[in-house]
């Protein structure tokens, strides 16, 4: 009788373990403000591949300003293309726009977006021109059943009303308030996503303002624009930024229990 009882308890324990939420780890690799610093690229592929070798669920993300800052890239036959070719080769998944994406005008940027083999999202730029594509505000990726929403925003504070740059680069474009758009799409996506990420080129000061309001609903903010190294938790949201010039790559580890976020942490890996 006791033997049967022990066997029953073992069976119950095994069943409970089998029914328990599965624990998985999702890794977001992030860059921002690379500014064409292709001289710092050699260590990037090895860092990305090392992560992919050890983690099964990896997403590669960029928060804007991919060119303007290195003559080899900026004076190439197609300015900026060496960086885009590298990003395509590495298998980037998602990116948003930075202010320097507009440096060569809308038609040029439209062609560059067409050449990008990854999703480009920006929730606060609308276009009524035929030279610039209407970008999606977000994308939802599925990684092993985990639904990850990425919303993109770009600064409109320096223009004012648009990113810093030549006025002619922004004709026919409107840049609604990025914080308002970030909140709007967070509310829309949160019910259908297990993980929600804001890919922001507002600057960490504006990111902090957004999170301090307590209504963001994001799990992680991958930031850019202000060239800072940022790793802080605000109201339950992890705010990150990797600095500039491809000196670092950000590694955000999201621990999942079932389809819920159980914890997040961040570290920088030096590439310089």
Regions found by a protein language model. Give the residues of each.
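Bacterial N-terminal signal peptides that target proteins for export
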Residues: 1-8
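Small side chains
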Residues: 8-11, 149
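Acidic, metal/ion-coordinating pockets
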Residues: 19-271
